[in-house]
Each structure stands twice: as C-alpha cells, then as structure tokens.
Amino acid sequence: MKLRVHNTLSGLKEEFFPLSSEVVRMYVCGPTVYDVPHIGNIRASVVYDIVYRVLLKLFPEVIYVRNITDVDDKIITAASVRGVKCDKVALHYEHIFHEHLGLLNCLSPTVEPKATQNIGKMISMIQALIDNGNAYSVGGNVYFDVGSFAEYGVLSKRKKEQLVYGVRVEKDVDKKHPGDFILWKSDDHVYWPSPWGNGRPGWHIECSAMTLATLGADFDIHGGGADLKFPHHENERAQSMCANPGSQFARYWVHNGFLTVNGEKMSKSLGNVVNVDTLVESGVTPNVIRFVLISTHYSKPLDWNDAMVGEAINSLIKFKLALLDSGVLPKSKSHIGSLNIGVCSDNAEDEEVDPRSCASEVIVARNKRKAKNFSKKMNEIFNKFGGLGDDCSIYTREFFECMADDFNTPGAIAVLHKLSDGVRLVGAEKVNNLAHLLYNLLIFLGIDLGVRQSSVSEDFIRSQLQKRADCKRQKDFVEADRIRFALAKMGVLIRDHKHAPTDWVSL
C-alpha cells in the first residue's frame, strides 16, 4: 500500500519514499518541560503517535525520535520562582508529560534524547557553522548568519527580505542582520563551558544536534506543530544543512494544526487552559480525549468544545454497544472489566531504569521491542481479516487506504461507523469477525473499549438512575432528561427497555 504525505517543504501531497526501504527515520519536536502540558501540546504527541503506528504497519522498522527540551528560559524562570534547581522542574514536568501520554495510550518513541545530555554535540555543531562561515561570535554570544544560507525561508514560504527585516526580533546591536538568531547565549547563571565562554545553547541548535546524533545528517520525516514552522523549523533546517554541506536534512516536513478552546486561543489570563488532568477530573475519559484529538485531520485547526466531546462520546458508545451486542465484549463486564483478545498492548512490564537516562540502551531496546510487538500483532490480525474475502476485507482495505492517505483519521473513523452499522445488520455467522475487526481497528487507533476508564462510581450511577426513575414517576421529564444528559457527558449511556429494567453502559 502506497503512503502519501503532505510535505510542507513542497506544499504538495507526495508519495512517501524513505531513504531506506528497511527503516524509516522520524524526528518530532517534543515538549519544553516547564509546566503541565496543555491539550494543544498533547494533540501534537497524539498526531505523531498515529503517524508512528501507520509507519509501523507499512515498514519493517521505524526509528522515532522525540526530544525533551530541559534547558530553556522558561524552565529557568520557573525554577527561580519556585526556588529550586532547573533539573528538578524539568524532571517533574517531564514525568507529568509521560503520565498524560500513557493515559492516552501513546506508544513510546524509540529514543527520547534530552538537550542537557547533548551539550557537547551542540558546541561541536556551532563550531562547524563558524568554520563554514555561517555563524559568528560576538562578546560570548554566537549567532547564525541568515544571509549565508540561500534557501532561508523556503520551508515557511517567506521571502528572505521579509524574514530578515520584517519580522519582530530582539534588538541586539551585536547582530549583523536583524534576523540572525542565537546559537550560543552567554550566561553565568545556568551555563556550560564553551570556546566562547560560559553559556547555554539556543533553542534551535538543540534539535539540530539531537537529530544528527540519533538519525544522521539526512532522515525521512520531521514533525511538529504549525507554530514551529517559523522560526524554529526554518532555523533548524538552515543550521543543519549548513553544518553538514550536501545534506538535505529532513525530506518530508509534517505539521499539525493549532488547537483552540471554544473558539479562543488558550491563555492563563482567559482561564481557559485545558490539560489531561482537568479533563479527566471533569469526567472526560482518556479514550474520549484521544478520540476528539484524532477526529479532525491532523493538519487542520481543531476547536475543543463540548459539542466535540459529545460527538466523541456518542461515537464510542455506539462502537461499544456494537461490541457488547456481538459478544466481543462480555455484557457482564461492560462497565467494570477488561478483555484481552490477543491485541497489542503498550503496558508490558518495564525493566528498572534510571528515569534521568531517557536515551539509555535499555530504554531504547525496550521501546524497539514494544514497537516491533505492536507491528507484528497488528499485521497478523489485519492480514487475517484482509484475507477473508468478505466484508472484513473491504472494511480493512478502506480503513488503511484512509490511514495511508496522509494519515486521514476522519476518513478512517467514517469506516468504523460503517463497520459498526454492519455489525448490527449482518447475519449471525458474520457478526463475530466484523465485531473483532471493529475492536482491533480501534486498538490500532489507540482506543481500547475493553477497559472501563470512567471515574464515575457504580454507586453514583445507581443513585442517579433512582433519581431519574423517581422524576419519571412524578412526570418531571425535564429533570429526568437533565440527569440522562449529565451522565452522558461523563461517558455513561442510560438504556431504557420496554420489557426489561433500565441498564447502563459506561466508557
């Protein structure tokens, strides 16, 4: 199956040809760990988790690198405010980041290098840029000379004159041009020794050095949020190509769209910053969060709002009912149990490792093993369904055609709705295969409906059902409906039956 990817560099949807047919190399800009990640940060991680899953399905091996920026002005400020060291702040928020991605069932990247573990490589790259005539040192600072790179602006589709003279930049009399950017910042507070004096690296050089260290001078895919296209990715591309003459750096650039909340940009001043913890505390399950994030094409803007959450809940309830009614999920455990039918899990027991060594050989080997297990299991399952020669083959093909068409998750979800409808319409002899296919396609997307995630207790649900029954007897249907809708927002579906007691299904 051919994979097509929208390449920001060309502005076109292109057929994907990796440098090697045996291994795909992908780098994604990870978090700057100074605060709890908001849902916009998490969207990017979920997007590239989907990309990773598709690549694992289509290619023998994938090396997925996502960095951790653990030295930055924002981290230094946060540490100063708290009166602690920078590494304590960084480790704390790195842990929360990983915790949130674990809740959303994201596969671990192959390698997760940290900026502070690669300072020497950054210094070497900066020296190479100076030697090649692309950078200059002034007063302990080192700047990249944007005028020395003819392709500057190609990625972000901006004219060099606009970039150099038209953008808003810091006033710095040491710069040759207003658009020149920092490679090494002189600092005697948080610093490392260098040929130019004590200081620390600029943000852009960090990713360039870590891609070179983990993937080499040329690799296949570079991903990140649309907000990183300029200046971060433009600068990263410039310094990497100049430090490694003849290199093309990343061949395909992929950018995910912005995320807003109720039509507005997230802001602490507006009080509308949303993160995984606050959503889960409000009753939104991790499966629902993930489903909302993949329900819009990765490249498009996504607005987080109650309507989107409601649509996700309705879809997942529909899928779960199809799985319950088919017997794939046992009805006796529909709200409290889990089911293992031989699909991949990312929750295998891990070796004891030093949490400060995210790029250690042990962790890399573990992550490669998990990715290989996921790829093997998924291919075994879908080769089986794809070879049945019936509706299963059709749905399997349609689903993966969508996923191979620029990671079209909305199209793939539409196939799931058709498949779910099919589970209810076909004869008994076909139900089992179709329902198992539905379950496994959801697993491929990172959604496991076999595990109850709702934090709403059974006692609370029963008490609400009793209140609702009392309201109906008293003909207070407005309040009865309010209770029903309130439970639905928490992922609990009430089912009324003509000749049987009311029951419920929980996500």
UniProtKB/Swiss-Prot annotation:
UniProt keyword list: Aminoacyl-tRNA synthetase, ATP-binding, Cytoplasm, Ligase, Metal-binding, Nucleotide-binding, Protein biosynthesis, Zinc
Residues the record lists as binding Zn(2+): 29, 207, 232, 236
Native source organism of the sequence: Neorickettsia sennetsu (strain ATCC VR-367 / Miyayama)
Signal sequence extent: none
Residues that hold ATP according to the record: 268
Enzyme class: ligase
Gene Ontology, cellular component aspect: cytosol
Gene3D superfamilies assigned: Cysteine-tRNA ligase, C-terminal anti-codon recognition domain, HUPs
Molecular functions (GO terms): ATP binding; cysteine-tRNA ligase activity; zinc ion binding
Official protein name in the record: Cysteine--tRNA ligase
